[in-house]
Amino acid sequence: MEERKLRFAIPKGSLEQDTLKLLQAAFYEVKGADRSYRPSISDREISLKILRPQEIPVYVQDGLHDIGITGSDWVLETGADVEVLRDLEYGRVRLVFAAPASDDSTSIGQFLERRLSRGLPVRISTEYLNITARTIAQNPVYRRYFGEMRPMIVTPWYRVGENEKVGIYLSFGATEAKPPEEADAIVDNTETGRTLEQNNLRIVEQIMESSATLIANKEALKDPWKREKILDVLSMFAGVIESRRRLHVFLNVREENLQELLSILPGLKSPTISRLAAPGWY
């Protein structure tokens, strides 16, 4: 009988190293990730595949993988129908609307108003076509000018949307380099904002925050064997995440100072106390 395996997609790129550290901390030994997209893992019931985080939500949705780690931004961008199991609390970035530093707009609405009121087109470069299109289409200023018309989404292969005055252009990277020649503004993720500043851009408005997220295929969760295995992985990750929030402090204290110390030490219920061999000490 063929051995069953849980198919686990992990992200390449900026999330990769922290993901490997999480797996290691959860007692999964991963080998070959630096030279193969199919690294080995110490759990024989799991198979790993390294993929771009942009791809993982749809592959998990379609059952090509049972679980995956990706950014919550890409779950939203793809609209994938997956079960979000847990925020893994690393890879935190902000998705922001940014414009040239010479523009002092304080909101997306103000930026749109200043251009549209002068009859100027709006060109936005981004990897996040759907999030950007929704954000712009729902903006009150945009709706006042164009109602229900959809912004034009532009890629090398297709154009969708009715409104050519507001174009959202697919970026294949180096998005911060697009303004002012190819774009009037961008939507991109940033951790510190330094790269934007170095390219003479400033943040106009934050759209969302994103972090690494564990997701699962909904059908896989209905399979008893896969569900149990997925919950095992989730439990191991949860243990690592919770342990990172806490400190283990070991100290010796005289018996007469014990109650005073207990009054200030935190714990899940109470600190663990052991009496030492020496009289009057813990």
Identify the residue ranges that each predicted region occupies:
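Small-molecule-sensing regulatory modules
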Residues: 1-50, 69-83, 87-92, 103-109, ...
